[in-house]
């Protein structure tokens, strides 16, 4: 959750949203939360291999329109607000062919069924039978194409048992790729362990995502950056990278701009959940093993009271 305008209301909405997502009660949240995305700006990230349009949704979610400029074909990640997706595709004059769903929680998959009615013939990918309108179930290292772009599916169970991250690259290109991480990896944070263990999150972050090229751009599912960095500062108060990123993120939020994307290389400098091998993080947790450190700091984060500064 982000701090700032209407923060008391947003705390309540975020808590409600998490509950609705776990219980499949997305419609209960719909009327309450659409308004906040109007205060957050869209952003188009021009990568040499693709264009990515960041589409704010609900209180703090992101949807991502991935555009292959060679073919003008596009995919959408987690289209919880279908009408916004349709409008973005029209703006860019692209053909929407593919839905990439990271996990079944309503604030990510809740728009699938409406979108496929608005755009018949869409291919809907995901790793969990609980995902609405699913047409193609994928597993770890499954691959698919969006125009000339290659999409590799990475199984990262923990937040949910069927969570998939999507690594998008262009064959033969030396330019940075992108990974769409849903609720597994956030800027300076990770998702709650609703259906998994610390060992699974360790494998997801360090052994799956952490082994991608360091310059890979990370597009996560929520704008949680300021709060995540305040917890990171609590864990490592002497880490200059955290202090610098927090100051930058506060400035971005103040003007309604996204703090996404980061890169994997950056995450290893300030994300405590990516830094569980570091002595400073282990000492804070009172542990000497990366997995038990992961478990300890996740439990602490779940109870962390975010300072107002």
Curated annotation (Swiss-Prot):
This is Hydroxyacylglutathione hydrolase, mitochondrial. Zn(2+) 2 binds at residues 107-108, 183, 222. Its EC number is 3.1.2.6. InterPro entries: Clx_II_MBL (IPR035680), HAGH_C (IPR032282), Hydroxyacylglutathione_Hdrlase (IPR017782), Metallo-B-lactamas (IPR001279), RibonucZ/Hydroxyglut_hydro (IPR036866). The modification N6-acetyllysine is found at residues 90, 117, 230. The keyword DNA damage does not apply. Pathway: Secondary metabolite metabolism; methylglyoxal degradation; (R)-lactate from methylglyoxal: step 2/2. It catalyses: an S-(2-hydroxyacyl)glutathione + H2O = a 2-hydroxy carboxylate + glutathione + H(+); (R)-S-lactoylglutathione + H2O = (R)-lactate + glutathione + H(+). The keyword Acetylation applies. Thiolesterase that catalyzes the hydrolysis of S-D-lactoyl-glutathione to form glutathione and D-lactic acid. Transmembrane segments: none annotated. Zn(2+) 1 binds at residues 103, 105, 159, 183. Residues 1-24 form a transit peptide. GO terms for biological process: glutathione biosynthetic process; methylglyoxal catabolic process to D-lactate via S-lactoyl-glutathione. The modification N6-succinyllysine is found at residue 230. PANTHER family: BETA LACTAMASE DOMAIN, HYDROXYACYLGLUTATHIONE HYDROLASE, MITOCHONDRIAL. Binds 2 Zn(2+) ions per subunit. Its cofactor is Zn(2+).
